[in-house]
């Protein structure tokens, strides 16, 4: 198979370390790197095929997890951060020089407000939670991927043990529905 889903997936998954304490993420600039410190491991780490997430060059998917907002702090070169799309629900903070997305934060009322979206692959520390599933898989078609190649994409995910969804995982979709029902007074 010639396609690259993501470097952390293409050759099989590396299991994370239980109780992993977190670490630092760095942009790709050769010097004066943005540094973001994460005070815990990520949760719900997954491959994402949406058109908004940052992806390594040549990859069809990003790998992104969430972490409580209070566990995220910018610890160097915050002046280089810029918001990619100020109208998006997830405010993706990227390096204004190299373009790497450092973290995404939700400021509006949303089921995931209080969680930041991060790419643990930007860390030089090993042990982060491995991807757990693949989300928004069909969305790569909207970005120009040929529909007839989707069986190969799904088979490649399945070969490394990842279930594929065209939304989020059932647990995350349940969390969204629960939040919505509570806000509507149904729960």
UniProtKB/Swiss-Prot annotation:
PROSITE patterns: CENP_V_GFA
Keyword Lyase in record: yes
Keyword RNA-binding: no
Binding site for Zn(2+) 2: 48, 50, 53
Binding locations of Zn(2+) 1: 27, 29, 95, 98
GO MF entry, a single one: zinc ion binding
GO biological process: formaldehyde catabolic process
Pfam families membership: GFA
Enzyme class: lyase
InterPro entries assigned: CENP-V/GFA (IPR006913), Formald_GSH (IPR014185), Mss4-like_sf (IPR011057)
Source organism, top-level taxon: Eukaryota
Cofactor binding note: Binds 2 Zn(2+) ions per subunit.
Coiled-coil ranges per UniProt: none
The entry's keywords: Lyase, Metal-binding, Zinc
Pathway the protein acts in: One-carbon metabolism; formaldehyde degradation; formate from formaldehyde (glutathione route): step 1/3
Domain CENP-V/GFA: residue ranges: 20-166
EC code(s) of this entry: 4.4.1.22
The protein's required cofactors: Zn(2+)
Reaction catalyzed: S-(hydroxymethyl)glutathione = glutathione + formaldehyde
Function as written in the Swiss-Prot or TrEMBL entry: Catalyzes the condensation of formaldehyde and glutathione to S-hydroxymethylglutathione.
HAMAP family: Formald_GSH
Record-linked PANTHER family: CENP-V_GFA DOMAIN-CONTAINING PROTEIN-RELATED, GFA DOMAIN-CONTAINING PROTEIN
Family from the record: Belongs to the Gfa family.
Protein name: Putative glutathione-dependent formaldehyde-activating enzyme
Native source organism of the sequence: Talaromyces marneffei (strain ATCC 18224 / CBS 334.59 / QM 7333)
Source taxonomy: Eukaryota, Fungi, Dikarya, Ascomycota, Pezizomycotina
């Amino acid at each position: 198979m010639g396609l690259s889903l993501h470097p952390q997936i293409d050759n099989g998954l590396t299991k994370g370390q239980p109780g992993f304490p977190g670490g630092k993420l760095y942009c790709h600039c050769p010097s004066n790197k943005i540094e973001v410190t994460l005070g815990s491991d990520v949760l719900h780490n997954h491959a994402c095929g949406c058109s908004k997430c940052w992806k390594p060059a040549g990859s069809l998917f990003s790998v992104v997890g969430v972490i409580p907002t209070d566990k995220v702090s910018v610890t160097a070169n915050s002046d280089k951060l810029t918001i990619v799309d100020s109208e998006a629900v997830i405010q993706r903070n990227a390096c204004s020089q190299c373009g790497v997305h450092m973290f995404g934060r939700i400021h509006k009322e949303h089921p995931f407000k209080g969680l930041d979206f991060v790419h643990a692959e930007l860390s030089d520390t090993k042990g982060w939670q491995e991807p757990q599933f693949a989300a928004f898989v069909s969305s790569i078609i909207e970005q120009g991927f040929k529909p007839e190649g989707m069986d190969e994409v799904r088979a490649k995910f399945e070969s490394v043990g990842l279930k594929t969804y065209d939304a989020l995982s059932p647990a995350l979709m349940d969390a969204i529905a629960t939040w919505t029902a509570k806000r509507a007074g149904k729960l």
